Amino acid sequence: MKKVFARKYMVVFEREEHDEFVVYNTKKEWEEGHTHIHTYKQAMYLVDCILNNKIPKKVNKYFLVSLQRLSTSKKYKEQIQRRLDGDTKEEYYNRPKYYRK
């Protein structure tokens, strides 16, 4: 494997024999902190989402599971799990200002 890109604690390797990329979080063990991605563009997007705690809307289930696998933040993992379960957001009701407590 050849190291292609690194930013903070995220590293992207290229596996030439399988024509794919491996994204690895150095804060985790190898077994639970890496994922395989087919394109360099997807690998870069995965790193960007992890570092900025973004949850993309139009991605497949494998991408969301990869985000969950690479993340170290418990809150971020819970948000991704809600998206995987089908719940998009937490329930929120904006009370009017004139509402009596």
In which residue ranges do the predicted regions lie?
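Short N-terminal "domain-start" leader segments
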Residues: 1-26, 31-32, 56-81, 85-89, ...
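A short, charged, amphipathic alpha-helix used as a generic interaction element across diverse proteins
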Residues: 25-30, 34-56
